[in-house]
């Protein structure tokens, strides 16, 4: 770091798409540092790899949005939220430690919210390679998988909920859309609409 008193924080994730839980993660991290780097994992096919602790992370259905699209989502959401510190958005290949120095300063403080065992694996991996890590236990309030499934349902690629015991209809496409949009920053919804994100996800779920 150019200034020994400056703390450069680092968060990372796939952000497929960037949702309210991710925004809360970044806002917490911003309170722990003077500058924040948001690292996008699975930035391109060369950075995608199978992980035993997170076996679905390389599934194409779980990676519908390209790096530059996620960069736009994150930049738009954080610009609107104003976390109070300068923010940079860069790739971060969590499964390729030999490349980390190209994307995150060696003395950055890696900040992780632990929601599942995979997050502990990542924290341990960072520590094993000499990285400073701070973790906080948290509960998942938004599911990226749930958002993608709702987007696929809106596109008609997956079945709606079956009728209830009284014969009432399952969820409509309008309700599916309202539900996932309520879990995503409005600036991100605008990007997703512009890139036809619902259709993209729907196509992947149909393959």
What would you call each of these model-derived segments?
Residues 1-207:
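Nucleotidyltransferase catalytic core that binds NTPs
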